[in-house]
Amino acid sequence: MAKQSMKAREVKRVKLANKFYAQRIALKNTITNLKLSEEERWDAVLKLQIFPRDSSPSRQRNRCRQTGRPHAFLRKFGLSRIKVREAAMKGEIPGLKKASW
C-alpha cells in the first residue's frame, strides 16, 4: 500500500498538469515555430521554465486505483497486476479468466 502522501502528490500533479495544459501547449508551439524571431522563441522558453515542475505531464506516474502501487500497472484496468489477479480470481472482471493450456 502506497503512502497517502504519495497518492496526494500524484493527485496534485494531475491537477497542475490540467491547469497549465493549454498554456504549455501554446508556449511549446511558439518555441517550435521557426517563422518567429529567435528572441520571441527564447522568451517562450524562459516563460516555460517559470512554470511549476509538477505541471509537466511527464512527471505523472500511473498508480493502482486501489493500492497506489506504481509498478506493474495495467492501463487497461487501472490496477496493479496483483489487484487484477485478485479481481480475476473472484470473477469481478467480465471476460477475463485464467489462462490454461
Swiss-Prot record:
Pfam families: Ribosomal_S14. The keyword RNA-binding applies. Keywords: Ribonucleoprotein, Ribosomal protein, RNA-binding, rRNA-binding. It comes from the Bacteria. GO terms for molecular function: rRNA binding; structural constituent of ribosome. GO terms for cellular component: cytoplasm; small ribosomal subunit. GO terms for biological process: translation. The keyword RNA-binding applies. InterPro entries: Ribosomal_uS14, Ribosomal_uS14_bac/plastid, Ribosomal_uS14_CS. NCBIfam families: PRK08881.1. Belongs to the universal ribosomal protein uS14 family. Binds 16S rRNA, required for the assembly of 30S particles and may also be responsible for determining the conformation of the 16S rRNA at the A site. Part of the 30S ribosomal subunit. Contacts proteins S3 and S10. This is Small ribosomal subunit protein uS14. It comes from Buchnera aphidicola subsp. Schizaphis graminum (strain Sg).
